[in-house]
Structure formats: C-alpha cells, structure tokens
Amino acid sequence: MERDFLGAIGKDEEQRRHAEERKESDYFGAGGGAAAAAMDWSFASRAALMSFRSSSSAAAAAAREETRELAFPHFSALDGAKMQQASHVLARQKSFGAESHGIPQYAAAAAVHGAHRGQPPHVLNGARVIPASSPFNPNNPMFRVQSSPNLPNAVGAGGGAFKQPPFAMGNAVAGSTVGVYGTRDMPKAKAAQLTIFYAGSVNVFNNVSPEKAQELMFLASRGSLPSAPTTVARMPEAHVFPPAKVTVPEVSPTKPMMLQKPQLVSSPVPAISKPISVVSQATSLPRSASSSNVDSNVTKSSGPLVVPPTSLPPPAQPETLATTTAAAIMPRAVPQARKASLARFLEKRKERVTTVAPYPLAKSPLESSDTMGSANDNKSSCTDIALSSNRDESLSLGQPRTISFCEESPSTKLQI
C-alpha cells in the first residue's frame, strides 16, 4: 500500500522531470527526443576499441529503464547536482573542438556493466565522465598527442606525472596517428672540379676547394703581368734589327772624312746615279774609241769610290754592304729603253752647250761634274771640243774625264 501511494503521488512529478530532461538532451544534440533514443556505449573490461550497439537494442534498453523507473521510483537530493555535472561535461565536450568539425556529439548512456552498476539507473541521457583509471593505455601511439621531442611522454618538466588534456570518446584526435619528421641534415657542398686549359691541353682536377682555386688564379694573374713585357722584348731579338742599330753609331766616325771629301760621301743616291749617267753616255757615243775610253774611265772611277771607305777599319762592313746593294741596284734602276733615250738627250744637250757657251763657267752642273779639273784643263778641253770633229775630238774628250776623277779638284768647284 505504501508503494502504490508513493507511486501515485510522485507519478506526475516524474513525468514532468522526464520531459525537462528530454528537452535539455535535444538542445545539446542527443537526438530527436523520444523518437530517437540515445546511443549506448559499451565498455569492455579489457583495453579494446569501442563498439556501437544497434538501435533496436538501445530502444529495448531504454524501455526497460523506463519500466524500472516506473516500478521503483527513486528520489534523491543529489539529482540537481548530477544534472549540473552532466551539463558541464557536455560543455567541456563542445569546448574540446569536436563540434567545430561537424561530428555529431553523443552522450554516453549509463550502461550497466561491471564496475559501472553502482551509478543511479534513473539517469537516461546523462553523460558519464571517464574515470582516471581508464582501461585505455595513455602510452598507446593511437592516443598519443603530438608534442615536442624534448618533452617526455610520461613525466613533465616539473617532475610530476604528465597530464593529458581531457577529451571526448567521439573526438577525431583519438583515431588519428601522428607522423614523425626526419632530421633535416643539409648535405655538405662537394668540392668542384678544376679545369685548366694550357698549351692546347685540357687538365681536369677533382675535389678542388674554392680556396685552392683562388690561390691558383692569383698565381696565374701574377705570372701573366711580367710575362707580357718579356715576350715583347724577346721578339725583336729574333729579328736582324739590332745589328742595324749597332752599325748606326759606327758610321759617325766617318764625318771627318765626309768633310774632306764631301762629294764621295755626301749621299749614297747621287753616287749611284753618277755612274749610271756615265754608262749611258758611254753607250750613246757612236765611235768605238770613245766608248772604250769611257768604259775604262768608268771602271777606274768606280775603284776610288769604293776603295777609300773600305780602307777604313771601323766602317768596313757597312760600306761593303752599301757597295753590294749599289751593284745589285745599278742594272735594275733604269730600263734599257730609258737608257737609250737618256743618252740621246744628253748628247744633244752637250752639243748645244758647247756651241752656245764657249766658256766652261756656263756649263750645267752635271757636265761640270763630269768634266771636273783645273781651269786651264777645262779651257783646253772646251777649245778641243769646239774645233775638232774627228777622232781627236773623242780623245780630247777623254783626257779631261780622266783628270776629272781626281780627289782635289771637285771639292773646290762644288763649294763655289
């Protein structure tokens, strides 16, 4: 009788309390109120993964719990505190971050298993906190939280036990594995190859450090600076120019000789041109006797021109070179046709001069150089040329020419 009386009195209050709990569970995302029952979490006695029960078993368990509560109602003064505790657990689950990833949050039902049978059975949708003595191993790599490599897993920096942050069973972090990054060891730069091109050959050296390469380049740059002037200085030594430079100062002692004989050493070009004019005159003369005399005179005149400079000991070599070059140039200087025309021109000019000017002072410098001598000899030669027209004329012409090559008379005439 007392049980029926107590059940009738508390029936209305029990129904009102259940309605409020369902509204609160719907607000925190437990499901669709009375239509969708809460999912039951089953915990094994050993460390294993969680498994979900089917919806039919969950509905049957919920029906059994309702019938038990109706049959044996139980009232306690700690019901309000338990409701606040459940709301705090749900708020903690939300703050952990599972709601932000879009994962539905389910409250763990009060399963009647083993050590959990001591909890009050009338709390239907209340959340349950995992106790400190959890069957899950915190050192399991599946539940290990990524941390610094210097921080140990079991012991913190202060020496106490390492405290892991609280997490819900439906959290995505629980089933994730964290990879370990390998050490980033930068490979050392290998020594480069050194390639040297020298004298048309290629030399390659391996494992040459930059310092050694810089030293080699520095030595090469230092060696290239003095080598350039030395090569320039050695090049002229291979040529014949230095002997020519040595002979230039040796010609200077011949200056006193040039003062004594200015006609012979004054310039090499006129000395070469004079024998050419004499040879042309000799070839142009019609008489055989005059040609023979002129040739003999030319050969005789060439002797004094060459012998005095060769007699001097210092300038012996340059004078011999000059004579050889003059002998090589003489036949090549004037062609044969020009020689004949020049001889005819000189012959006619000589005839005009002799007919117009009977005195030797009016002669041209070329003819005066050919007919050099004393004043008496020149007068006699001019009279002989004007009066004679036979072989005596040619012989008289030869006499002043033989005398004209004396060493004393030409100097006086040219200076005046």
UniProtKB/Swiss-Prot annotation:
GO terms for cellular component: nucleus. It is found in: Nucleus. One of its GO terms (biological process) is regulation of jasmonic acid mediated signaling pathway. The keyword Repeat does not apply. Residues 1-25, 283-319, 357-416 are annotated as: Disordered. It comes from the Eukaryota. PROSITE patterns: TIFY (PS51320). Ubiquitinated. Targeted for degradation by the SCF(COI1) E3 ubiquitin ligase-proteasome pathway during jasmonate signaling. Keywords: Jasmonic acid signaling pathway, Nucleus, Transcription, Transcription regulation, Ubl conjugation. Residues 283-302, 366-389 have a biased composition (Polar residues). Belongs to the TIFY/JAZ family. Repressor of jasmonate responses. This is Protein TIFY 6b. It comes from Oryza sativa subsp. japonica (Rice). The lineage of its organism: Eukaryota, Viridiplantae, Streptophyta, Embryophyta, Tracheophyta.
